[in-house]
Amino acid sequence: MNQTAILICCLIFLTLSGIQGVPLSRTVRCTCISISNQPVNPRSLEKLEIIPASQFCPRVEIIATMKKKGEKRCLNPESKAIKNLLKAVSKERSKRSP
């Protein structure tokens, strides 16, 4: 093999090995763009999701799905009102479980 062919093979190998670690999708990010500090009535909740911090999003996210219209709201986990909501929901769940 001549030197040009060897050089081309090496360049192709280096290029392909560099591509291996690149993620295919760049859409991984935090779910919540803005957060609300407003209190939420636990009776109006259909679902409450708590998403822990991860390598893709550095903050804890709390997503409340409302019964009416299925509206989703991102709640501030540091807000006193939201902390009280989490306590109320936790207390309600512990009453229901045997």
UniProtKB/Swiss-Prot annotation:
Query: What is one process in the GO biological process aspect for this record?
Result: cellular response to interleukin-17
Task: Establish whether keyword Disulfide bond is in the entry.
Answer: yes
Question: Which SMART domains does the UniProt entry name for this protein?
Answer: SCY
The UniProt keyword set, sorted, is: Chemotaxis, Citrullination, Cytokine, Disulfide bond, Inflammatory response, Secreted, Signal
Q: Which residues form the signal peptide?
A: 1-21
Q: What is its main location?
A: secreted
**Alphabetical list of SUPFAM superfamilies matching this protein:** Interleukin 8-like chemokines (SSF54117)
Pfam families noted in UniProt: IL8 (PF00048)
Q: InterPro entries, from UniProt?
A: Chemokine_b/g/d, Chemokine_CXC, Chemokine_CXC_CS, Chemokine_IL8-like_dom, CXC_Chemokine_domain, Interleukin_8-like_sf
Q: List the disulfide bonds.
A: 30-57, 32-74
Q: Which positions does the record annotate as the modified residue Citrulline?
A: 26
- Output the PROSITE patterns linked to this UniProt entry: SMALL_CYTOKINES_CXC (PS00471)
| Cellular component GO terms held in the UniProt record | external side of plasma membrane; extracellular region; extracellular space
> MF terms per GO, please?
cAMP-dependent protein kinase regulator activity; chemoattractant activity; chemokine activity; CXCR chemokine receptor binding; CXCR3 chemokine receptor binding; heparin binding; signaling receptor binding
Please report the PTM annotation for this entry: Several proteases can mediate post-secretion cleavages. DPP4 cleaves CXCL10 on its N-terminal 2 amino acids leading to an antagonist form of CXCL10. This dominant negative form is capable of binding CXCR3 but does not induce signaling. MMP9 cleaves 9 amino acids instead.
User: What family is this protein classified in?
Assistant: Belongs to the intercrine alpha (chemokine CxC) family.
Briefly state the protein's biological role: Pro-inflammatory cytokine that is involved in a wide variety of processes such as chemotaxis, differentiation, and activation of peripheral immune cells, regulation of cell growth, apoptosis and modulation of angiostatic effects. Plays thereby an important role during viral infections by stimulating the activation and migration of immune cells to the infected sites.
| Oligomeric form and interacting partners | Monomer, dimer, and tetramer. Interacts with CXCR3 (via N-terminus).
Task: Tell me the protein's name.
Answer: C-X-C motif chemokine 10
The encoding gene is CXCL10
